[in-house]
């Protein structure tokens, strides 16, 4: 598989929904496969909340977050398709964000423009223009990436042939907004946060970020999977992360939260949770989802998982039902999924076959 990683400069102004603007910006992007002469085999893969451009392939000890799905003869066959995977603006894996420098050569910190999903789509559209891609064969993503896919179908109906919306929703629920607010507050209460200017003090609020991620990670799992995997098993003494840990599930969350805090940026975390909170595709349409979808021309596939309590199956059904009422072509698949919200990330023969058939159908 041909893999290229590039940091691409978009030397044009991005007017953000907040009223702020970026005069130029960079998008860290992975490319898999080759773009054909007609440039009609392009696929855009949108990552979830804390994901990155590294969707496939192995780099050192790191394997792409959708490696089982992208590659030669895989679900998204790179013998046929050219895949672009973009690190979202505001994230911390190479694209412009709080860790980047502003026009004065200073780190943005928490002064990076507040973004919305529609801004991400606009930045990706500018990338497509630069690549000479007039129409994506497919835009696909899970969770926050699925929301981007839906926004693409609405914002640029003539630029998308197919859309895959996985474990996502048309708007963020009040429950998710509440959880995100708690996570933000935990980060801000860390003594090393310094009102978001921690880099100026050579600090990082790792304790707060760790705790926030531990809370967030619980929402990605399912009660059934947690019971099957951990139950009430006690953690062995020789592998305890902390002295006061008793159960395996505690140790697991301590480990996951700690590793995450080593890799992620707290200001990005806060910014991205707000991006999620602000998403409501029917805002400005009197909450009429059917009306929003009137101009969509892409064929849609919506996949939900019954074990997902972050974006439950009812969210996916809502999107597909509104699409059908708007006389759009939409298929809906509901799977149990072993891993709760994260089920969209894991290989499953029936799930992958459904995606592959959708992607390759004419």
Model feature map: region roles:
Residues 318, 324-362:
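Catalytic active-site module of serine/aspartate enzymes centered on a nucleophile-bearing elbow/loop
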Residues 165-259:
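Alpha/beta-hydrolase-fold enzymes
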Residues 135-175:
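Conserved hydrolase catalytic core segment
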Residues 296, 302-304:
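Short beta-strand/loop motif that positions the catalytic acidic residue
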Residues 30, 34-102:
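N-terminal cap/lid subdomain of alpha/beta-hydrolase-fold enzymes
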Residues 63, 74-128, 177, 181-199:
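Cap/lid segment of the alpha/beta-hydrolase catalytic domain
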Residues 1-45, 59:
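Catalytic-loop region of hydrolases
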Residues 309-315:
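Conserved alpha/beta-hydrolase "acid-adjacent" motif
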């Amino acid at each position: 598989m041909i893999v290229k990683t590039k940091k691409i400069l978009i030397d044009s102004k991005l007017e953000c929904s907040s009223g702020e603007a970026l005069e130029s910006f960079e998008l860290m992007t992975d490319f898999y496969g080759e773009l054909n002469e007609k440039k009609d085999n392009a696929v855009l893969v949108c990552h979830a909340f804390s994901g990155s451009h590294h969707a496939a392939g192995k780099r050192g000890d790191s394997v792409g977050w959708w490696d089982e799905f992208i590659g030669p003869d895989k679900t998204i066959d790179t013998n046929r398709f050219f895949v672009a995977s973009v690190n979202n603006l505001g994230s911390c894996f190479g694209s412009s964000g709080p860790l980047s420098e502003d026009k004065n050569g200073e780190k943005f910190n928490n002064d990076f423009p507040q973004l919305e999903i529609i801004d991400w789509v606009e930045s990706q559209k500018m990338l497509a223009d630069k690549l000479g891609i007039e129409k994506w064969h497919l835009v696909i993503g899970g969770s926050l990436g699925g929301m981007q896919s839906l926004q693409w179908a609405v914002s640029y109906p003539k630029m998308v042939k197919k859309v895959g919306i996985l474990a996502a929703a048309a708007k963020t629920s009040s429950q998710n907004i509440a959880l995100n607010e708690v996570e933000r507050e935990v980060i801000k209460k860390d003594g090393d946060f310094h009102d978001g200017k921690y880099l100026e003090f050579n600090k990082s609020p790792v304790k707060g970020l760790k705790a926030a991620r531990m809370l967030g990670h619980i929402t990605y799992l399912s009660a059934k999977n947690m019971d099957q995997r951990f139950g009430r098993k006690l953690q062995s003494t020789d592998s305890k992360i902390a002295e006061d840990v008793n159960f395996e599930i505690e140790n697991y969350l301590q480990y996951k939260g700690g590793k995450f805090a080593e890799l992620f940026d707290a200001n990005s975390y806060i910014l991205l949770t707000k991006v999620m909170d602000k998403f409501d595709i029917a805002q400005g349409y009197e909450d009429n989802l059917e009306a929003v979808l009137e101009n969509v021309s892409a064929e849609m596939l919506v996949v939900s998982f019954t074990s997902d309590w972050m974006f439950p199956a009812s969210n996916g059904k809502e999107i597909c039902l509104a699409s059908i009422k708007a006389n759009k072509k939409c298929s809906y698949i509901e799977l149990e999924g072993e891993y709760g919200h994260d089920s969209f990330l894991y290989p499953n023969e029936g799930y992958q076959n459904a995606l592959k058939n959708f992607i390759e159908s004419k």
